Structure formats: C-alpha cells, structure tokens
C-alpha cells in the first residue's frame, strides 16, 4: 500500500491508515490520488472522500478543509468529518428533506447560506451512507 492518509479534525484524528488510492472532494471537483502523485496543496469542499484499501472502498464525509500531498503522505485537515459506517441512512434522508425545506423557506442571505450549507452536508451524508449498500464509488 502506497499512501499514508491522515484525516485530522479539531476534536480528533478521524483516519490514520495506509491505502492504495484516495478520492478527495476539492473545491474544483473530485481529485484522485495514487502513489507517486506530484506534491500539492488543495482546498477541500463539503463532500465524500473515498479511500481504497485493496479492493474495498471506505467513505468519509468531509466538511471542508485542506489537503497536502507530498511523498505519498496525505495530510487532511478538516472542519469536521464523519465515517459512512456511523451514519444512519434514515436519519440522513430525514435531515436532507428538512434542510431542503429550510432552504425553500429562507428569506435573508444569511438564512439562505446557512440552509445551503446544511443541505450540502446532508447530501454528502446520504451519499456516503448509500455507498455502504451498493459499493458504487460515484
């Protein structure tokens, strides 16, 4: 396994393991990283990070942050994160519906921004939880 991946949130180490591949949700789209990748620093968006260890994919929801890639070391600093394995799909779907309603009811720019952020987080949580049932990475 070629990559050492560390995901660190303000309150804990979310992930610290070796893997063969990682797909990151960057601010400009998904970014795949394999062993030998060129050094880079990138902003991360709210979305699902996927990690491949042998033939198994693991999904982790990231709530924005930064990633640094150098010498097969990936350091990911995030505002928050949640592993797909701890997400309750029914609860996540309910939150998706509620956040969509909040967005529709929002009046001020601040309310719209906050509702949009909640909606994006809810969508990412549902997407990650769904990967547990069908193992599709997209």
Curated annotation (Swiss-Prot):
It is found in: Plastid, Chloroplast thylakoid membrane. The keyword Plastid applies. The keyword Calcium does not apply. Its main location: plastid. SUPFAM superfamilies: Epsilon subunit of F1F0-ATP synthase N-terminal domain. GO terms for molecular function: ATP binding; proton-transporting ATP synthase activity, rotational mechanism. It is a peripheral membrane protein. It comes from the Eukaryota. Keywords: ATP synthesis, CF(1), Chloroplast, Hydrogen ion transport, Ion transport, Membrane, Plastid, Thylakoid, Transport. InterPro entries: ATP_synth_F1_dsu/esu, ATP_synth_F1_dsu/esu_N, ATPsynth_dsu/esu_N. GO terms for cellular component: chloroplast thylakoid membrane; proton-transporting ATP synthase complex. Produces ATP from ADP in the presence of a proton gradient across the membrane. F-type ATPases have 2 components, CF(1) - the catalytic core - and CF(0) - the membrane proton channel. CF(1) has five subunits: alpha(3), beta(3), gamma(1), delta(1), epsilon(1). CF(0) has three main subunits: a, b and c. Belongs to the ATPase epsilon chain family. This is ATP synthase epsilon chain, chloroplastic.
């Amino acid at each position: 396994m070629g990559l050492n991946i560390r995901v660190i949130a303000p309150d804990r180490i979310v992930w610290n393991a070796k893997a063969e591949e990682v797909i990151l949700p960057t601010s400009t789209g998904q970014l795949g990283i394999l062993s030998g990748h060129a050094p880079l620093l990138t902003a991360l968006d709210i979305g699902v990070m996927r990690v491949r260890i042998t033939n198994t994919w693991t999904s982790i929801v990231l709530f924005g942050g930064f990633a640094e890639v150098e010498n097969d070391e990936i350091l990911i600093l995030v505002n928050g994160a949640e592993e797909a394995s701890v997400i309750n799909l029914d609860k996540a779907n309910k939150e998706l519906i509620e956040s969509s309603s909040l967005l529709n009811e929002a009046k001020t720019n601040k309310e719209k921004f906050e509702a949009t952020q909640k909606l994006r987080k809810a969508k990412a949580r549902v997407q990650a939880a769904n990967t547990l049932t069908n193992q599709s990475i997209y």
